[in-house]
Amino acid sequence: MKTTSISLRTIAAAGVLALTTLLTSCAGGDEAEGASASNAKTTVRFALDWTPNTNHTGLYVALNKGYFEEAGIDVEILPFNNSNPEVLVDAGQAEFGISFQDTASMSMASGADLKSVLAVEQTWATEVAVLADRDDIESPADLDGLTFGGFDNPAETKTMQGVVQSAGGEGDFETVTLGTSAYEALYSGDVDFTVPYVAWEGIEAEHRGVDLKTFAYTDYGFPDAYQVLVVGNNTWLEDNPDTARGFVQALARGYEDSVEDPEAAAKILQEENVGLLTDLDMLVESQQMLADDYMLDDNGDFGIQTEQHWSELGQFLFDSELLTDNNGKPLDEQPEWSEFFTNEYLQD
């Protein structure tokens, strides 16, 4: 699936970026002065973590419905090209991007200039998966001595060890790094378990007639996490609070629409990515699953983050020595988790 597709809207945004840069070249970092001088929309760059999928639906819904335009913003989507969105945002090459709580925590602990501004999914959306006919595997505790098909995520092996240990096992298994080939390796029996995204690869497996048995991390006492986040460049956020608020609120509206009408949102996602996403039934099923089970918190709200949620997974990452400084040395004490996220841009 590592194909890169640039929609017509993305190409158009690139042209707008060039024009906006020309018009506002004398405006500097003062967004109010720039707007009054040129009346041009502000360009905001958003980095994707993968080819477009239902994790990104709210972005495309907001584009399609003109929510960003209402906020005076032109969005330039930076397609996935093997560059980590966190790296692009930290370097100022994108204002916002998709991220994940574990990797975002590790990046910010080491000094990355990031802040999480919105939680797309409130809970883990990946689960441990084995073939359904593996009668010898009834819980993650049974994975000791087996082979894990991994993805080269810096936290994944210790996370799997933590899940196995939480279930009563030792966490002693072999990891082979396969990337997206891990799914085929599981289906063919070349690895014993992997971690599909249940609202995507889980549905794909079902459509292919592959029966899986899955185990949710939190069912065994492992801490929960925000599976998908939107992070912003912290310096840019502080320098451009009005644009940041306009962008985040427009984006949140798109995701909220995706919860309220998953089928319509899935159709928009497909329309905005012509030729790339061809299976509408799968898109609708995936979007419905996310809307029902993952995108809203216990109060029925979208996007909100809490310090407790950050600190619970953070404690595991700290104890596992996955949080290091910019020299790679494990931190001596936990970070101030409240500094890693903000809800302020969701509020008027």
Describe the predicted segments one by one:
Residues 239-320:
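Secondary-structure end/capping motifs
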Residues 310-348:
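Conserved C-terminal helix/tail region of periplasmic/extracytoplasmic solute-binding proteins
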